Amino acid sequence: MYIVQIASECAPVIKAGGLGDVVYGLSRELEVRGHCVELVLPKYDTMRYDQIWGLHDAYRDLWVPWYGGAIHCSVYCGWVHGRLCFFIEPHSGDNFFNRGCYYGCPDDNMRFAFFSKAALEFLLQSNKRPDIIHCHDWQTGLVPVLLFEIYKYHGMGNQRVCYTIHNFKHQGFGGPEILWATGLNREPYYFHYDRLRDNFNPFSLNFMKGGIVFSNFVTTVSPNHALEVQFGDYGYGLGHTLYLHRHKFRGVLNGIDYDIWNPEIDRFIPVRYTAQTLENKAKNKKALRDRLLLQDVDKPIVAYIGRLDEQKGVHLVHHAIYRSLFKNAQFVLLGSATERGIGAWFAHEKSYLNNNPDVHIELGFNEELSHLIYAGADIIVVPSHYEPCGLTQMIGLKYGTVPVVRGVGGLVDTVFDRDYDPHKLPEQRNGYVFYHTDPAALESALDRAIDLWYTAPDQFRQLQIQGMSYDYSWNYPGKEYLEIYDFIRHR
């Protein structure tokens, strides 16, 4: 099968969040399974050119229709860790992708509307006819609209589109100028409730809604999140649209890259280990304490790794620090704040707890240190308010670090409470789950994890081993996406 991924990110060359990891991980898994995969990406000035091998201009004269004229583009070709990627660079006064950033510009809607148009124009002019076009998030939500409304009539009528939504919070909006620019000229037709018109603002077009309505299949990043966005508040206004298209909507759990996140081969940790040599985890725990100047005592280490913001349940992260100390545990935090007020709050906590031998707060992100924390900690907390999939808990399980999570989104699909999960046998349970957003709920789960570490170390070790036995690689998601591709090809 010939598959083209159209996305605004692909790790490690373009990475602002988890989207880049998913695009790369899925592409690699599909290639391992014997399929031809190519990626089409914007050529940002800030992307990591050192991660591209053999970059060269492959198509010098791509003219993309835009408003009443056309914008001249160059298309560069190169290999990103074995994946064949095409990077589109427009030559215009707008400098769409020479902004010193990936996102955050006032005209992001125009930037990515143009990218969607340019990606399809490139496929058309280069005579590429993939079986499947897989696009991601609002930035490429117009791809299926443009494909089936314009490019279908220029020889691209046999392609099928799978559209994956990673974050419903950011949907992409625009006015009629988007239609004029891209050639979708029938304004009353597209400003219709069943097409692109936003469900809240009748004067706005919604890119993500367009992707849902016009694509052949829609996925999000976990089965439980697929239910949340239809019937809860997490669809951010698109719940009814998703429900209407539920026959082509499914949650597919993301995977993690076990070539990177695997204690058996991890190059960032001093002592490698497996479930059979779990005693070596203690050596990494000592190395973590030595590096962070924690006192070397017989206590569990509780950790948090991730952003410090409301989505991640920052108030519960803060509470977990002091609750861990109260329960005679140590706490390690590695995170960066997205808001100035939260950053100042945790900077104050770092200063206040600076002389406490049982706490270390590291503000910012350090990939090497994150590996050591996963390998050295006993428990990891993921108290998210909103978590479409979540990778932290999957990595923790692989490293034998018991997750304590809030039962939301993909956390429900991956962590099963040791004491109370009614759907799993005791030998299939792998962590602790709480559901409410108050500190008492967090305590109900965190206390049980710490108490088990102290009172029943053999049972705690068994819980670690059970967690390490789960396979959250790209193996199963890759298989599921291939089933979706086959389904829409033969509809």
Swiss-Prot record:
It is an enzyme of class 2 (transferase). It catalyses: [(1->4)-alpha-D-glucosyl](n) + ADP-alpha-D-glucose = [(1->4)-alpha-D-glucosyl](n+1) + ADP + H(+). One of its GO terms (biological process) is glycogen biosynthetic process. ADP-alpha-D-glucose binds at residue 15. One of its GO terms (molecular function) is alpha-1,4-glucan glucosyltransferase (ADP-glucose donor) activity. Keywords: Glycogen biosynthesis, Glycosyltransferase, Transferase. It holds the Pfam family Glycos_transf_1. The keyword Disulfide bond does not apply. Its EC number is 2.4.1.21. Coiled coil: none annotated. InterPro entries: Glyco_trans_1, GS/SS, Starch_synth_cat_dom. CDD domains: GT5_Glycogen_synthase_DULL1-like. Pathway: Glycan biosynthesis; glycogen biosynthesis. PANTHER family: GLYCOGEN SYNTHASE 2-RELATED, PTHR46083. Synthesizes alpha-1,4-glucan chains using ADP-glucose. Belongs to the glycosyltransferase 1 family. Bacterial/plant glycogen synthase subfamily. This is Glycogen synthase 1. The lineage of its organism: Bacteria, Bacillati, Cyanobacteriota, Cyanophyceae, Synechococcales. The gene is glgA1.
